[in-house]
Amino acid sequence: MTQTFDPSAFLATCSGRPGVYRMFDADATLLYVGKAKNLKKRLASYFRKTGHAPKTGALVARIAQIETTITNNETEALLLEQTLIKEWRPPYNILLRDDKSYPYVFLSDGTYPRLSIHRGAKKAKGRYFGPYPSAGAIRESLSLLQKTFQVRQCEDSFFKNRNRPCLQYQIKRCKGPCVGLVEPEVYAEDVRHSVMFLEGRSNALSDELNASMEKAAMALDFERAAELRDQVALLRRVQDQQSMDGGTGDVDVVAAFVNPGGACVHLISVRGGRVLGSKNFFPQVGIEEEVGEVMSAFLAQYFLGGVDRELPSEVIVNVVNEDFPALIDAIEESRGREMTISHRVRGTRARWQQLAVTNAEQALAARLANRQHVASRFEALAVVLNLDEPPMRLECYDISHSSGEATVASCVVFGPEGPIKSDYRRFNIEGVTAGDDYAAMHQALTRRYSRIKAGEGKLPDVLLVDGGKGQMSMARDVLNELQVPDLILLGVAKGTTRKAGFETLYLNDAAHEFTLPGDSPALHLIQQIRDEAHRFAITGHRARRGKTRRTSTLEGIAGVGPTRRRDLLKHFGGLQELSRASIDEIAKAPGISKKLAESIYANLHSE
């Protein structure tokens, strides 16, 4: 604890009412936000001479100032605490890294509605189903619906401008409503069945499909009967996978597990007795190391963190603590509806609870095992580089382009716990000779390290460059120009066979050349980081190239600016469909005159 902070003097004037407290260090950086039923009693507990966990002791040692806000009750304190945590993200609080809105299945209005994934505000007209706990869970449901009922999932702009069915029709994933290959009444029936499935009425849907199958067979419509038989078989398979015996309501099953290496919270989402999916959360554990504290902090941030998440009627948890009564009041007050938190459960609910606990334990064990695996590779690299201790931060750069087109440089960052994706960066390379990888790398490194020198970001301990002597020399020139000190430069080039395991490595200056055995953990780490930089560069390049190619063909046409280009491509569903359109069809697009349509058509067919 700093000498400038006197806890005795502070506690002498501290209120014993409910409220929120904020702890700051000597630089006025917010360290921790907490709530209390009795502020004075809670804050006094921090300054006991014994009994602190290591993280709590580290926090107390940094305190230079404490501010408090008195509230009318504990519920108000909890709501204010969550607002401050979300705004400031203090380092000693438990923090959820996931803050995205959860996805829904969206069914649009119209004669031929579309099924799609939706995040964010529900502004479009139609129906929303969910939320689903992950994008993977929602894609699984959409894939099943596509196979079973063949409701379209294409963009409206693509749908409106088809003159022949697409590949989805050929592989029996769509019935071709875009070109009139299915009657509106038949399509509406498929949509109705999809809605029944999404609402969790799978048993009623199975009964209805079975009855329709028997009716079709009696009418000797064997083709229709076979189609319905396949739908029933698919549906039964999914029911077996997703059903929760004895469950009919909307329930979230949440289990928290904590050990010295970290924490995991596993959430299973059940809607209408059907499992929509599950998700692991690995919160940044602050000073609360008890599993009950982790659970209450998770639920508070999950349901009060500002993200639009559906409130289930019941949440089953594996642990509770004294904060739960105030937590339930705060959630119900904030969300405007009742919710039950259950802990001591029996029968089916007890099995759900245990399943969530098992998943949380296994997920954390797997995460820690992977972290230890990466850490051991860092230790091996330290031996190779003759370092006293493992490096804490590695950066790797790569270049991707197609014959010089849409050049993108990538920067990926790794630490002993694995990739640090929040620090990944891409650089769109401009103003260099097409295909000049040296110039592209020079520009990327200059931009990156100029920003770091200006205080934006951290210097790595090791800079890994994917390339041979030329790239190494160029990287060294950049570091010298910018006067970047004490940075280990490591180059990796493919060997003569160009196979993994035969790489040639260069250390600091290109003259220091060596290789590592194919089974070397240090080499495996280098390969892992290099491959990740390559992947990140390629995905960025493809996105940039696709955007360029979608617009470049239209850029030289007088009267077609950026807005019209975007509107044209959106109207026709892409450049390929626009190229197939006639002059009259182009003229029907919003804001396009007959004369401009003729000019667009002529430019698109000039070759």
UniProtKB/Swiss-Prot annotation:
Gene behind this protein: uvrC
SUPFAM superfamilies in the cross-refs: C-terminal UvrC-binding domain of UvrB, GIY-YIG endonuclease, RuvA domain 2-like
Record's GO cellular component terms: cytoplasm; excinuclease repair complex
Entry protein name: UvrABC system protein C
Source organism superkingdom: Bacteria
Any one Gene Ontology molecular-function term assigned to this protein's record: DNA binding
Chief location of this protein within or outside the cell: cytoplasm
Any GO BP annotation: nucleotide-excision repair
UniProt xrefs under Pfam families: GIY-YIG (PF01541), HHH_5 (PF14520), UVR (PF02151), UvrC_RNaseH (PF22920), UvrC_RNaseH_dom (PF08459)
Keyword field: Cytoplasm, DNA damage, DNA excision, DNA repair, Excision nuclease, SOS response
Subcellular localization, as worded in the UniProt entry: Cytoplasm
Function recorded in the entry: The UvrABC repair system catalyzes the recognition and processing of DNA lesions. UvrC both incises the 5' and 3' sides of the lesion. The N-terminal half is responsible for the 3' incision and the C-terminal half is responsible for the 5' incision.
Family note: Belongs to the UvrC family.
Domain GIY-YIG span(s) in chain numbering: 16-94
Subunit and partners: Interacts with UvrB in an incision complex.
